[in-house]
Regions:
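Short alpha-helical
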Residues: 20, 46, 71
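Rhodanese-like catalytic fold shared by cysteine-dependent sulfurtransferases
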Residues: 5-6, 31, 53, 82, ...
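Local sequence-structure signature of Cys/Sec-based thiol-disulfide redox active-site neighborhoods
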Residues: 2-35
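Non-catalytic, surface beta->alpha helical segment in thiol-disulfide oxidoreductase systems
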Residues: 65-91
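Loop/helix-junction capping segments adjacent to catalytic residues or to phosphate/diphosphate-binding pockets
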Residues: 22, 45, 79
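Thiol-based oxidoreductase modules, predominantly thioredoxin-like and allied folds used
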Residues: 35-48
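Thiol/disulfide oxidoreductase modules built on the thioredoxin-like
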Residues: 53-59
Length: 91
């Protein structure tokens, strides 16, 4: 059996401390028992600029799963409700 069968995809989430959508996104991931790398962009204009260049958006959260840009919480929630999130996680 391959060791990669149970490997969770890499998940990165760019957040700020006082963002309720960030909290909601992290809660959704945690409900699914997923671990993620949180990148806090508070007081980090360099990271904010990088985030905007990568995502095309200046809002947080911004979420990537295995280098696939999901978007913010609204898009993550839509992926969860449609079953797309489970498909992305099973790749």
């Amino acid at each position: 059996m391959s060791a990669n069968l149970n490997k969770q995809p890499d998940i990165e989430i760019f957040t700020t401390v006082n963002c309720p959508y960030c909290w909601a996104a992290k809660e959704l991931l945690e409900r699914k028992s997923l671990t993620y790398k949180e990148i806090k962009v508070d007081n980090r204009p360099d990271l904010r600029e990088k985030l905007q260049n990568l995502s095309g958006s200046h809002t947080v959260p911004q979420i990537w799963i295995e280098n696939v840009h999901i978007g913010g919480f609204t898009e993550l929630d839509a992926c969860e409700n449609s079953g797309r999130l489970d498909r992305l996680l099973s790749k």
